[in-house]
Amino acid sequence: EGAAPLLTFEFFTNNKQGDPHAGPYDGAAKHKGDHENTARVDKNIAEGKLDSRIDRAADTVRTFVAGPDNTLNTQDDRKVYIRPGHEMNGTWYRWSATANQTPTDYVNAFRHIHKRFDHVGLTNKDSIQYIWSPMSCGSINDCDPTHLARGYYPGDRYVDWVGVDAYNWGNARSSGWQSPETIMKQALDEVSNIAPSKPLTIPETGVPSNAGGDKNQWFNDLYGFTSYYISPQKQRIKMLNYFNNKKKEDGTLIDWTAINSADDHRFPAFNSLARHDNYIGGNKKNHISTAQFQGR
């Protein structure tokens, strides 16, 4: 209560359920590049072949937004962010460009999902906001150089926020330890120029433990950069989400966590970041306002 969830809508489902139009069972290709001549999930979505799944998701979100009285556009409505097909400019998801689909197909898929959610009554911008977030590739060079983020932009009518996912991999990858500014600034500048009227967000960021640098200091740097960054279009970062998880990446377990149940004070800089006056935490006594929800 008091917070607004952010739901990432990924364009794949469990093929064991028998849907020939869904993506692979595990979401990503088993080997990098495996998807390049096979995936056409963007086209399938745009052509309506996955509407039954999309509509079930839309109905679930509608029930959540409607609140206890189960009626939209009343005082007990809840707020939610929807993020369809994130990191589309990379090479690891089946909604990226392939031999069988283009960035235009992704745009059409994003718009189609938006329209299906509209169809169940989720049209009030006080309650639902859509986020478009490509990957900040930095020096990792994992992104597709032939299909840049701009080509995937669905348009101002369908997008309420723009942002980037950005990770400091440390020595887990060849890029080495990188500052928040290094991994975020260039990509934020880019999405700012693509959508100059939209508020900026970092829907995902993370830094691993024991990966060649000072994680606690990195959180201090994250606070500084996100608080003082101003885009070429004079926008500021209005929302930040941290990837507080442990996850296997290429067979190696990486500990991204800043807080966990065993020891939530390992990184005091993260706790300090979340408690600064210019951060709004959702809680029962301090509900996020509509203006804050919309990045105003």
Task: State what each model feature region is.
Residues 42-56, 97-108, 175-186, 211-221, ...:
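Alpha-helix N-cap and loop-to-helix initiation/capping positions
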Residues 56-60, 136-154, 178-192, 217-229:
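Alpha-helical scaffolding within the catalytic cores
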Residues 88-98, 118-182:
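Flexible, surface-exposed loop/gating regions in the mature catalytic domains
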Residues 11-15, 86-91, 135-140, 166-171, ...:
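Solvent-exposed loop/turn segments at secondary-structure junctions
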Residues 1-128, 132, 280-283, 288-295:
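Substrate-binding cleft of extracellular glycoside hydrolase catalytic domains
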Residues 110-147, 197-211, 237-245:
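Aromatic-lined carbohydrate-recognition surfaces of secreted/lumenal glycan-active proteins
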Residues 80, 198-296:
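Substrate-binding cleft of secreted/luminal carbohydrate-active enzymes
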Residues 8, 157-212:
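Glycoside hydrolase catalytic-domain groove-lining segments
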